[in-house]
Amino acid sequence: MPSIMKIALPALAAATTAYAQSCTVSATTTIQNAGDATGLASCSTFSGSIAIATGTTDDIALDGIRRLNGNLVASANSNIKRISASNLDTLDGEMHLDGLTRLYAVEMPLLKNVDSIKFNALPNLQQLTFTAEVDQASKVDIQNTALRSLTGINIEEVDTVFIANNGYIDEISMQLGNVSTSLTLADNNENVKVSLPNLIWASNLTFRFCGSVSVPSLQTLNGSLGLYNNGFESFSAPNLTSIGEALAIVANENLSNITFPKLTKITDNLQVANNSRLVEITGFPELVSIGGSFDISGNMTNVETPKLNSVRGTFNLQSSDNVTATCAAYQSLKNRKLIEGGFKCIGRVVDPGQQGHNPTSQSGSKTGAATSLSAVNGALGLAAMAAVLLF
């Protein structure tokens, strides 16, 4: 073998080994500029995490990489405007973009699979270019962006969704079939239209400050359902049969109709309060049992749950209007010991309130001591939901 070949072949082998190693790294690879990103283009699969440096001012294009077996992180950068990955279809870690105040474009047209998405403080990001649609992710957390919609994120199954404080978002629509931990949509554009047409099963659902919510296929909730401060006039869960924890419908100022035609069981508390236009509650025709407290207050003239035969906790119904007939029906349940806890049912009060509240009658006198709570589990259920809202 010529002497030059004896030198060249080992050198070529070493270069090949070095190249292979450059696509697999144990430490996080930090991208300082566009050139660093271009240097990874020959890696169709990159094993390791990539971080974009806080001082980067270039647009970053991670073209060539089809699979990133790690995280993609960019944070605390006030200069970067565009992040793209034209060939990326799978990201096995987290896409974490936080505090990128000038970022206006995230372009990954082939991306479909991500372990988790976490976006926060992206005030100029109005849309996502996920043309192929991300349909697999375990967690989605999007807060404080300028997104107008979630077009491009169309998850089928998820552990956790938290979408909050996105003041411009007009629409949230996903093909979600089940939510194993929680879905929270809170404090976005108060007119946002929420559509979850395929959602059948979930653990916990919380909707706060939404313009409309559609869950036509929802059948089972293992946890709680909370509707707070929404703007819609009606809410329906036409196929929901059971709720594993609490149902809370609170402070929805335009709400005049609620319909749960197939709901038979609420394991913890039923709480309906401060919905000023909700004067009739007749949307629970099949409800048989409440494992915690029955707690309804407001301006109602009529409350009917014709098949209810078990309330394990306290019964509280307070209204500013006349509910004499309603109270007579529920007094019958109490007399038959089908309501196990304390009982309070009263109308024509100035300040109807939730259980534990001692209202003032329209004549100006107090109505008597408030009933104590006997359903500890029910109380814990509502406390947990309150904690979610404070998060």
Task: Name each model feature, range by range.
Residues 25-39, 46-61, 69-103, 110-125, ...:
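Concave beta-strand-loop units of leucine-rich repeat
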Residues 218:
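Rossmann-like adenosine-cofactor binding region
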Residues 14, 341, 382-384:
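Extracellular/surface-exposed low-complexity segments
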Residues 2, 12-26, 387-391:
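N-terminal signal peptide
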Residues 366-391:
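Cleavable C-terminal sorting propeptides in eukaryotic secreted/cell-surface proteins
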